[in-house]
Amino acid sequence: MEDNAWLGENKCILVSGFRMQRRKIFVLQDCDPKTDIFTGYSRALDRKVCIERHQARPLLYGKTVDAYVVNESENDGSYLILNDRNISQSHLLDEYLKSCDEIDRYDKNSLSFSLLSPKRRWVVDAPKFIVSTSNQLCKCVYDVDMHWAFPVGMYAISADTLPTCLSRQITLAIYNSKLFSFYKMEYEKVHRKEKCVHFAAIKSFPIPYYINNEFRFVLDNLVDTIVAYREKNCSIGSFKEDRKAYYFQELIDMCIYELYFAGHMQKNNLGVVHELMKAPFMNKELDMEDKVAETYSWLMKSDNVVRQRIMLLDTRSSLILSRIHNFYFK
């Protein structure tokens, strides 16, 4: 990759969302996890039960994983119970484990609480990136709250096994980019008959093992700004409905193109990273709201070089980047 980055094989540890047996799952709903012992409703048992906090994990569904952030407005307070065979009954309250053992023993054909946990639970319980591939545009969040992902179609990437050059911000930028979503879509077309095709698409996507300082500086500041903005304004809706967030994602996509297509971007005079060093979001003296507002105003000026290069993408790279950048709207 000519100065910007060196790409290589993705050797990180990746695990899939958990799988279920007989379409049943061990879940408590409407939980209040503020105390060490909390109460939740079990639909399977049709009653409320108490459980120790450390025996449960917060549960993420596809609708709760948005680009860069967990959409708390869609979070229904569901928790997954860890149905481990080596957990003694004393660890659970209200005879919950005993009840589940009886159901599992006598009613296997209609109901089962048996849970196939991730092969590497330490990945799920440690800081990680959760990638959702269930929609045309993939979404990625950084998680430190020990969420378990549901269903299959959501994947956890161990943060500790990624190359050291990949900061939290750059990893979020890559897996929320149109380039990655486009790659996943094309990979699935070619390998659609293979098992675990989503998993294979993530593992086969090359990742940087070196990124120059200018790229790192711009992407770290850019992603920090959009994460803070999305956390405060997630209820606005998708990027299509939020014009400011939409244009921030445009900037991120352009940076990722330049990371992966450095020579092509340089040859066609489409690079934006150096120009973004002068953008308002790089000003550490501004708060998040001002960074977003001033960057948007800066980008909307007709003589803005970055804006012009985004608009020229379709003509200067009609066979490559235009196809990637516009696939979602076809």
Where are these regions (language model features)?
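Polybasic, glycine- and aromatic-enriched phosphate-binding surface used to engage nucleic acids
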Residues: 1-218, 330
